[in-house]
Amino acid sequence: MDLSLLKALSEADAIASSEQEVRQILLEEADRLQKEVRFDGLGSVLIRLNESTGPKVMICAHMDEVGFMVRSISREGAIDVLPVGNVRMAARQLQSVRITTREECKIPGLLDGDRQGNDVSAMRVDIGARSCDEVMQAGIRPGDRVTFDTTFQVLPHQRVMGKAFDDRLGCYLLVTLLRELHDAELPAEVWLVASSSEEVGLRGGQTATRAVSPDVAIVLDTACWAKNFDYGAANHRQIGNGPMLVLSDKSLIAPPKLTAWIETVAAEIGVPLQADMFSNGGTDGGAVHLTGTGVPTVVMGPATRHGHCAASIADCRDILQMQQLLSALIQRLTRETVVQLTDFR
């Protein structure tokens, strides 16, 4: 497993609409392998893996992470911020963050906020300034992006910890598929899509799908269980138990034919799956499957612990198994298979 790649993706700072640091990593890989690259109007990256007269398949992961944006600067030097995406309440107080300025300078600071019961409001970043002028002299302006200042780390037992695993694990899988299959003979035309602005309303998933117009889509994302050490029967997001296959969420109910086919392929190659359902929230799959006249879509990905906060934990074996399964699925998506998956008679 390429931990240096995962580290680079995790430590890149990219809230919605400001995803250049992640985009650049993907573009360097595509350019190195001389792949065709397109963009939608929001900045999503569309990489054409191969040419084929077969069906068109889209593998999608989003580039953006939850974070904050500078709203205003007080006379005393407090930097007021607003959340971008659903940052956990517990992660809105006393967290190390960094502000990326318009000149791409990184300014460290401490995030804090006012707690009222379970709610945290009036969030601000303290960079040690004593006045608005000192903040401005540091190059900070309203609109600058703020992300958690988290270093990627390798943990015991093949596990890793870092920020933005939602959804840099998916972006990592896009790159590994690009490397593995860049010169393979495939039955389908495959597009690897890194979408923009998922955390603020599934935006890039919709525009990118319009650009690709796929016959089938696989959306890569992550999720965690509310109680990290609950290993009960209801928890299908346990790290180390294999990738998640999301049967339903608030925005998408996966087609049974598609999920059954994936389960069959996973069994053939010995990859365990966790059949999961989201009681709250959704993914790009909600936008993807409603594009055009409708796209058969499924959501998959490695489970994590501690989502939408300063750091998450994942199991490298889950990531590798997800890569293995994606490769097998892509190599089996023939025209006949797609016809069977989309036959409603």
PLM region spans:
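N-terminal hydrophobic/helix-forming segments and targeting peptides
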Residues: M1-R345
